Amino acid sequence: MKNHSTTRRNLGIASVVVLGLIVASCGGKSDTAPALPAEEVVATTVPETTTTTTIPVVVNPLTGAPAADESILNRPALIVKIDNHPRARPQWGLNQADLVFEENVEQLTRFAAVFHSQGSDPVGPIRSGRAQDIDLLGSLNHPLFAWSGGNSKVTSAIRKSWLVDLSHSVANEKGGYRRESSRNAPHNLIAETTKLWSLAPEDAKPPVPQFEYRAADEPVTTASKPTIATKITMDGVKVMWEWNPDLLTFVRSQDDKAHVDMQDVRVNAQNVVVMSVVYGKSGSSPVAKSVGSGEVWVYTAGVLVQGTWERTDPELPFVYKDITGEVIKFTPGRTWIEVIRAKSAINIAPGEDIKKAKYP
């Protein structure tokens, strides 16, 4: 919106007529001083002055995109643990999540889908939480955490953490969960984000931004190179993200098949973070160490930016920097974070054959 303020004034200069005085000179001769000519009246107009007030655009904290509905900005982030077992596919909600973390679990992967700017009714299938979720998701400012099942040690740790427990055992009696009749247990537990948000505590707070974003006219860092795809070996799953220049997004495949959601839409994201971490163990479960530092590849706007990730506290967002030490800026939109083991990904450059590129 523009505000215009205009000041106009005419400056007029009054005419001045000066009459000469008759002065007697010596010798009796007198001269009359000629009258000075009247000064010309000049009208001057000051140019119009325009003042523009720019109203800042309100953006969603987890996407950097303009907020379509500002009334939802104060609600908390909602994390849903989504199953990736072959019998759980296709899933509901992966293309509606602002962020998705893919984690290694026992010989498979699982998704931590983070909703804030929009929801998904239904969402799922929903499976168990893991000890690694506590630190990995800790920067989202006490988010709601929807999950189902887990051993007593993990359950106790989650309930004592900064994650707000909305597990099946807590929220099912309040109408938070239901079984999908077209699927078999345990791959058929689903929920509605609308209902889960309604169960948020009164003091719930919105998430803080997790990344820095480029302006629309801002170029990607020069510390980048063109890319067409990345191939990633996760536990029990082969993942590929391929740049689609027509859609201006990265599209996902797993196990050499296009990964589509329940609406038959290809799973996609504007940014893909491939973050190398050390995985420890807790019993039989892997535990990603998400505090510290390591190598990162950030795929955005059709390029690869290589650099490092760093995090000193689990309640702080990850900091991603390129090889020059500058913070990597993301493209506004949805982001996937692949939490991988070291040396589990390859980049595929323009001119290379995607089909011939082998998974690491």
Sequence positions of predicted segments:
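C-terminal motif of bacterial Sec signal peptides marking the signal peptidase cleavage site
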Residues: I22-S25
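Juxtamembrane helix-loop transition sites at the ends of transmembrane segments
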Residues: M1-K2, I134
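Bacterial signal peptide processing site
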Residues: G27-S30
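Bacterial N-terminal signal peptides that target proteins for export
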Residues: N3-I13
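A surface/extracellular/periplasmic glyco- and lipid-processing/surface-interacting theme
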Residues: A33-A43, P47, T51-A97, F101, ...
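Hydrophobic helical h-region of N-terminal Sec-dependent signal peptides
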Residues: S15-G20
